[in-house]
Amino acid sequence: MAALRLLASVLGRGVPAGGSGLALSQGCARCFATSPRLRAKFYADPVEMVKDISDGATVMIGGFGLCGIPENLIAALLRTRVKDLQVVSSNVGVEDFGLGLLLAARQVRRIVCSYVGENTLCESQYLAGELELELTPQGTLAERIRAGGAGVPAFYTPTGYGTLVQEGGAPIRYTPDGHLALMSQPREVREFNGDHFLLERAIRADFALVKGWKADRAGNVVFRRSARNFNVPMCKAADVTAVEVEEIVEVGAFPPEDIHVPNIYVDRVIKGQKYEKRIERLTILKEEDGDAGKEEDARTRIIRRAALEFEDGMYANLGIGIPLLASNFISPSMTVHLHSENGILGLGPFPTEDEVDADLINAGKQTVTVLPGGCFFASDDSFAMIRGGHIQLTMLGAMQVSKYGDLANWMIPGKKVKGMGGAMDLVSSQKTRVVVTMQHCTKDNTPKIMEKCTMPLTGKRCVDRIITEKAVFDVHRKKELTLRELWEGLTVDDIKKSTGCAFAVSPNLRPMQQVAP
């Protein structure tokens, strides 16, 4: 305590301008730096900022889709013509912008990401054997990056247990003639408190290229809205962190409590010359078209049944499509806190045209709004909420569901590569109720509810309820399905004919419920 009192008294006296520090007597801190020397170096030329990124380097590139990507630093990498990069990114965006430009220029050898999405260039290079692709669950990727920055070499997670992530064998590289050349390795598995967890290793990079909103001249950085995403953890997990921002302000412009990334993590800063801030999925609030076809009628039926799963005060994560549309039917008297994996709690409706903001998107890359009381955070925090069981409900689509609740929705090997995104994380917590919404059969009338999934799993024995346009099933992870509700006009025999496994019929079977329009 005496030392702390002495320290406070010395700091209270101040330091003469130009002084190099204060020497304290033995046993106390030796000096207090007051020189203007800072860790962060400021640049005017983005090419100069990245010119020492060499061939074969590992580079983290911040952003989520196109939101919060370092546009100017990516353009600078194109000009340096560096090649054989190993890129770590949440996903690969689109073909003609952002990370897609590096792929088009053949500068990337390997990508570690969670989602390919609609980037057909990435998918085609991967399937042709021209690109290595290590697909990693989004929350696991965020935590691997966070661990790398925190000096934690590895950690255990429930995400991916019972899937190719744990078992190994996920395709990383194909030969030009379509054969597997490189596959993922199995993970070590341990059991804690009766649940299974797999060992994941931390990631560090040679460089991190990050997009902030503002930086002060000390190198402290703040981000805008949902553009924190992977930018924040990546700042902390590279040997050299280069940040581009829209504005540079004087030291003291940010209240200390408002700084998102302290300057200890920042090595280089530049003010971006220009920003396109392209929006991947511009989505505007509009009245629904009342002219719905047969398929839309089926979707509406699922949506209106799914809306009955919401409870007042719950925290929920909704996948794109039917799950998100179900939120339109939440009663005005009910409060449901909607969570988005890219770092939002308190999602509101889609924006009007004058509310559109490129820095405010959901996990489906759609423009959104945030309700009063909503908040933003980085991707590692977002998935801590998910893995930690703080989300009561997750609702998502599926390609296949088994009678024991196995879920497949992320890949058709050799044909369709989307990536798991955050789905594996969302279904990994034992505390979260998982509801699947989907059409009962494929377009060729093949059942999607099956004895056993034939596609790679997203989660093992993780689904609690299935809602289709024909029926509602409850899933018992050690027994068969139970038919709970049936659409009017259909019989149990109709459901048996369109379902690929046996199921029990509830003694309290009732007509399929619908929320009031």
Swiss-Prot record:
> According to the UniProt entry, what is the EC number of this protein?
2.8.3.5
Known Gene3D superfamilies for this protein?
Answer: Glutaconate Coenzyme A-transferase (3.40.1080.10)
Hey, what tissues is this thing expressed in? Testis specific.
- InterPro entries on file: 3-oxoacid_CoA-transf_A, 3-oxoacid_CoA-transf_B, 3-oxoacid_CoA-transferase, CoA_trans_fam_I, CoA_transf_AS, CoA_transf_BS, NagB/RpiA_transferase-like
Q: Name one GO biological process term.
A: ketone body catabolic process
Subcellular location(s): the record lists:
Mitochondrion
Query: Can you supply one Gene Ontology CC term for this chain's record?
Result: mitochondrion
Q: Which residues cross the membrane?
A: none
Reaction catalysed by this enzyme: a 3-oxo acid + succinyl-CoA = a 3-oxoacyl-CoA + succinate
Instruction: Describe the family membership recorded for this protein in Swiss-Prot or TrEMBL.
Output: Belongs to the 3-oxoacid CoA-transferase family.
Q: Where is the active site?
A: E341
* UniProt keyword Mitochondrion present: yes
Species this chain originates from:
Homo sapiens
Q: What is this protein called?
A: Succinyl-CoA:3-ketoacid coenzyme A transferase 2, mitochondrial
Q: Where is the transit peptide?
A: 1-39
- Cite a single Pfam family from the UniProt record: CoA_trans
**UniProt keyword list:** Mitochondrion, Transferase, Transit peptide
What this chain does, per the entry, is described as: Key enzyme for ketone body catabolism. Transfers the CoA moiety from succinate to acetoacetate. Formation of the enzyme-CoA intermediate proceeds via an unstable anhydride species formed between the carboxylate groups of the enzyme and substrate.
Biological pathway: Ketone metabolism; succinyl-CoA degradation; acetoacetyl-CoA from succinyl-CoA: step 1/1
Provide the assembly information. Answer: Homodimer.
